[in-house]
């Protein structure tokens, strides 16, 4: 661990929980949590360009890679430790997303960070899906960079967050090791309210820097628990004859409304033909200034 540069040399085969266990005694964390966190490795994250829990800004593992070491059929390919370089093509970009085609990633120097102690969280409801994604756009384009900016459509908010099923839910969360997060959260909440979002002031959760996480109560906490359980529920539902899966993409804001409408029409029709009906829901996994990354879930009886 290089505490001064905030970087660590980590072997590619380490599983997510073990990686965090090794960094914790030093007071650091990688802070990259894909949904497969428990059963996937650092090397796997890098060669698949894994998306993590940050919904804005540092959304993918790319942002944490300082240098890589890969064993290839032609020998060892190792890049230099540099904070950045403008000297031609980046060798790390060859490794990121290579999916094992070039060789086996054995280790990497990763950018790490101090464990966050300041947290702030809010969950706002909207009368429509459209109002919810307009709020998400306003927040991300203000460049406040919340760690969490998840939008759930009414179906997903109803099944995973315990809402009535006729409201969209926007989850906003900030975290920092050094700076209280009340100001950025209140600015994000203000923007979301202006777009039609609803939340009582007492439901806005802000920690005092004691390392106590917030946002585990109410609809926000219910969705978080559902998100963690989701990968394990598929085996159970498959045994009950339920056909279900997920798919995701990204698209620019100007094309998003018509794209979403077309996807929903096509999937609803397919579920009706194949399963006699079913459910389709959507949430934003990551949100960029120029567009969202929607994640669709569907299920029906086989």
Where would I find each of the regions flagged by the language model?
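FAD-binding subdomain of flavoenzyme oxidoreductases
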Residues: 1-150
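C-terminal substrate-recognition/cap domain of FAD-linked oxidoreductases
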Residues: 114, 120, 125, 133-302
């Amino acid at each position: 661990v290089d505490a001064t540069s905030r970087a660590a040399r980590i072997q590619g085969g380490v599983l997510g929980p073990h990686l965090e266990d090794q960094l914790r005694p030093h007071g650091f964390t990688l802070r990259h949590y894909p949904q497969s966190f428990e059963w996937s490795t650092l090397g796997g994250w890098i060669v698949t360009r894994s998306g993590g829990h940050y919904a804005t800004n540092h959304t993918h593992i790319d942002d944490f890679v300082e240098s890589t070491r890969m064993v290839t059929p032609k020998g060892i390919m190792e890049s230099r430790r540099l904070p950045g370089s403008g000297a031609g093509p980046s060798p790390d970009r060859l490794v990121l997303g290579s999916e094992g085609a070039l060789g086996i990633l054995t280790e990497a120097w990763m950018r790490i960070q101090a464990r966050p102690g300041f947290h702030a969280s809010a969950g706002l409801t909207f009368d429509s899906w459209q109002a919810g994604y307009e709020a998400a756009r306003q927040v991300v384009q203000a460049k406040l960079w919340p760690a969490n900016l998840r939008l759930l459509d009414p179906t997903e908010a109803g099944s995973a967050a315990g809402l009535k099923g006729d409201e969209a839910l926007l989850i906003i969360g900030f975290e920092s090791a050094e700076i209280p997060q009340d100001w950025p959260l209140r600015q994000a909440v203000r923007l979301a309210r202006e777009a039609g979002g609803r939340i009582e002031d007492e439901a806005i959760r802000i920690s005092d820097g004691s390392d106590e996480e917030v946002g585990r109560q109410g609809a926000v906490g219910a969705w978080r628990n559902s998100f963690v359980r989701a990968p394990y529920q598929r085996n159970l539902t498959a045994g009950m004859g339920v056909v279900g899966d997920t798919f995701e993409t990204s698209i620019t804001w100007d094309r998003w409304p018509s794209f979403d409408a077309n996807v929903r029409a096509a999937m609803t029709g397919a579920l009706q033909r194949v399963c006699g009906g079913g459910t389709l829901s959507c949430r934003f996994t990551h949100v960029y200034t120029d567009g969202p990354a929607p994640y669709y879930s569907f299920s029906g009886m086989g």
